[in-house]
């Protein structure tokens, strides 16, 4: 496809992080554990996203919204859930969630795990599910090869039961080119310490009506802290990689779950990252970060000067993660780890970590956007329902 004219990638630097301050406008309230009902009693849920219509709204079937999330059986240490991750289909009616089972049939994915993505209902009642295939089908132990895959199953409504046709083909769309973006093909690794080429977020640019994917990626920097947000575009069904929109200049390893919301004719680019992936670790909080630009390709500038949009509170620095901003500016996430006297639960014994892990939908928040300034405001009347 013909390359878009693009501004140079925005560089997220130490200078920006030096502007970061504790402020109520960018701090989430402490989560009450009672406000986090477990949707699936035997499975962890994390990394939620709605099935969208092509206009960006959430798909509604028979009065129920369709959502997806990553899921894994509640076994062992919560960090091991990534080695068993499958995409789950969910229906939501108000504050009530219904489990619709795995989105795909066993063995349908080319990977050994299914990691985060996005989903769009098409006019022909199929659903384009863009997701990350991690590893290779049938492998043991799991590896960390990552590529972007599309499945396009038919949406089948049978009474109040909603299904995706299990016979859909899973087609690899993109993998890192090894030039603009580093290969994400490690055989061994762990969350927060591997290269990225994952989390495809679908976006239709109102300026040209074309479809794009935003991808969490890695670029070559002087050290390993070269997280980036890749852009890919399609023409006549063929996808190709474009230059990155944002590059972390030696300050962060992972810019995860990138997505764009157009608000007030401005392009708001959001992503999530964790405190332990900064350089040095804990230099900045786990949170939702973002940039804003007049067009898809920039030029981008960090929101609130630093890029920080929404941080976990100091008292609970890991309480939630994987924030996703919806078109109405409500923000969904999942409940991660509560604070523990024993320190970081990611490295704790399995039983201690399990006792402090949420593994379900976190309370809903809402943003206001005003130029380069943002603020967290109460999502009135909403608990776990965007």
Identify the meaning behind each predicted range.
Residues 1-386:
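Carbohydrate-active catalytic/glycan-binding domains of CAZyme proteins
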């Amino acid at each position: 496809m013909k390359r878009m004219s693009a501004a140079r990638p925005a560089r997220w630097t130490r200078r920006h992080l030096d502007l970061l301050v504790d402020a109520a406008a960018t701090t989430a309230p402490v989560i009450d554990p009672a406000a986090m009902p477990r949707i699936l009693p035997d499975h962890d849920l994390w990394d939620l996203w709605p099935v969208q219509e092509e206009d960006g709204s959430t798909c509604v079937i028979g009065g129920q919204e369709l959502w997806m999330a990553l899921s894994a059986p509640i076994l062992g240490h919560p960090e091991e859930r990534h080695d068993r991750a499958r995409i789950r289909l969910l229906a939501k009616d108000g504050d009530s969630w219904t489990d619709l089972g795995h989105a795909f049939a066993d063995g349908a994915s080319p990977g050994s795990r299914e990691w985060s993505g996005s989903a769009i209902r098409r006019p022909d009642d199929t659903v384009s599910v863009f997701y990350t295939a991690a590893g290779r089908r049938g492998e043991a132990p799991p590896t960390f090869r990552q590529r972007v895959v599309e499945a396009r199953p038919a949406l089948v409504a049978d009474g109040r039961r909603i299904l995706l046709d299990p016979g859909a083909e899973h087609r690899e769309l993109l993998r890192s080119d090894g030039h603009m973006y580093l290969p994400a093909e490690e055989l061994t690794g762990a969350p927060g310490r591997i290269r990225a080429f994952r989390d495809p977020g679908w976006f239709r640019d109102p300026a040209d009506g074309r479809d794009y994917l935003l991808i969490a990626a890695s670029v070559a920097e002087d050290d390993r802290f070269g997280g980036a947000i890749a852009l890919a575009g399609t023409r006549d069904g063929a996808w190709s990689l474009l230059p990155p929109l944002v590059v972390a200049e030696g300050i962060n390893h992972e810019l995860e779950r990138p997505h764009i919301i157009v608000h007030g004719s401005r392009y708001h680019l959001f992503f999530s990252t964790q405190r332990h992936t900064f350089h040095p670790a804990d230099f900045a909080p786990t949170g939702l970060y973002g940039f804003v630009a007049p067009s898809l390709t920039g030029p981008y500038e960090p929101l609130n000067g630093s890029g920080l949009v929404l941080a976990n509170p100091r008292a609970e620095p890991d309480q939630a993660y994987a924030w996703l901003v919806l078109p109405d500016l409500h923000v969904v996430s999942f409940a991660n780890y509560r604070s523990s006297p024993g320190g970081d639960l990611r490295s704790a014994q399995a039983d201690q970590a399990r006792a402090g892990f949420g593994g379900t939908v976190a309370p809903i928040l809402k943003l206001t956007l005003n130029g380069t300034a943002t603020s967290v405001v109460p999502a009135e009347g909403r608990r776990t329902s965007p």
